[in-house]
Design a protein with these regions (language model features):
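Membrane helical hairpin/interfacial module
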Residues: 58-163
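Membrane-interface interhelical connector segments
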Residues: 60-62, 303-335
Length: 363
């Protein structure tokens, strides 16, 4: 293996303290990942609630309490929960693959009789390592395919399902994750960040008056919308499934899920989650600062959308009016604000993870 693509396996390695966070028979189970996952599920539920607005043509009058909650949700939940999910998902896949490889290497080491020639031992372990990497890659890809299947079933009921999105990530990038292809993760992460920025910029442009300025009709403006609008009726399950396909693609290309998942893979190479007590001060200070950055990055986007999902505004639908909204933004600024929101959203997700790890970890 090249230095750029290390497989973190040591022959005959015993689980070290660094990797004992989860299931070792004689090891402490650190609660940080579990607490973060539980809190993340709460944030996902809150983030998905506005999705149901696509089922209603009319909206209830916005109250003061609604407005306050909308501002808090935009600052701390929207575009922050999905990257948090993705980081934990990438982290979990990396740990699962590492443990699979390490178990195979311990078994291969145990199969060697005493006094084995060093050269023969090295060849045996090299073959075992290659087979273990292939096995771990298949394991990750198999998990991904099952997630896509479960996501499709869930998508029949709820078109905004996110399970399939992470299944696609695991299936496509199984080798990258298992073998820690750092350069590939960096390049793909940068490319997908640019794709997400373009996608959100288009939606900001479409929601902020760009189609009218360009002379497009509402139907032309929504031609590239990533959301299929559904309405209750006999065809709803089929409509939801079609909507799920679009929303899965949308999440991959606009929600920073792939870059965040790769961050989670890199996180597995540290002890920030397994031993957060060693980094408590940095996690607390850095986490709080990251949440502030994430909250600040949401302000202009909330002014543009009024807290409504931006895809519901494409085609000329008005944003909910409250003290969070104001005079119409210039088209160029409306195009930029969702980009700022998703980029700072990833920062905010890192903030949540840091604070949760510091709170839940031993110490």
């Amino acid at each position: 293996m090249s230095p750029d693509n290390p497989v973190p396996v040591t022959p005959a390695a015993k689980p070290t303290e660094r990797y004992q966070s989860f299931t070792g028979a004689a090891s402490v189970r650190y609660p940080a990942p579990d607490v973060a996952r539980g809190f993340m599920l709460l944030l996902i539920a809150l983030a998905n609630a506005p999705f149901w607005l696509v089922l209603f043509r009319d909206r209830a009058e916005v109250t003061g309490a609604d407005t306050i909650w909308t501002g808090l949700r935009a600052a701390l939940v929207d575009h922050r929960s999905y990257p948090l999910f993705a980081m934990l998902f990438g982290f979990g896949l990396a740990i699962m693959a590492r443990r699979r490889i390490e178990a195979a290497m311990r078994s291969a080491e145990a199969d060697l009789p005493p006094g084995t020639d060093p050269a023969a031992r090295e060849r045996h372990l090299d073959r075992a390592r290659e087979a273990a990497v292939v096995d771990a890659r298949r394991l990750v890809r198999r998990r991904g395919l099952w997630m896509i299947l479960f996501g499709a079933v869930h998508g029949i009921i709820f078109a905004g399902d996110i399970i399939g999105t992470y299944g696609v990530i695991a299936t496509i990038f199984a080798g990258t994750i298992v073998e820690r292809k750092r350069t590939r993760m960096l390049v793909v992460g940068i490319v997908m960040t640019l794709v997400c920025a373009w996608s959100m910029s288009y939606m900001g442009w479409a929601a902020g008056g760009g189609p009218e300025a360009a002379g497009l009709t509402a139907s032309e403006a929504t031609a590239f919308s990533p959301v299929v609008r559904t309405a209750p009726g006999p065809s709803l399950p089929f409509d939801n499934l079609i909507g799920w396909l679009f929303s899965t693609f949308f999440a991959l290309t606009s929600a920073m899920t792939i870059p965040a998942a790769f961050l989670g893979v890199r996180l597995a190479d540290s002890d920030l989650m397994s031993r957060p007590d060693r980094h408590r001060r940095a996690l607390l200070v850095g986490g709080a600062a990251a949440l502030v950055v994430g909250a600040a990055g949401s302000v202009l986007n909330t002014r543009l959308t009024g807290g409504a999902p931006i895809y519901t505004l494409i085609g000329g639908a008005p944003a909910p009016q409250s003290f969070l909204t104001g005079p119409a933004l210039p088209v160029w600024l409306a195009s930029l604000t969702p980009v700022i929101d998703i980029l700072t959203g990833l920062v905010g997700a890192c903030g949540w993870l840091a604070l949760l790890a510091a709170w839940a970890g031993p110490g």
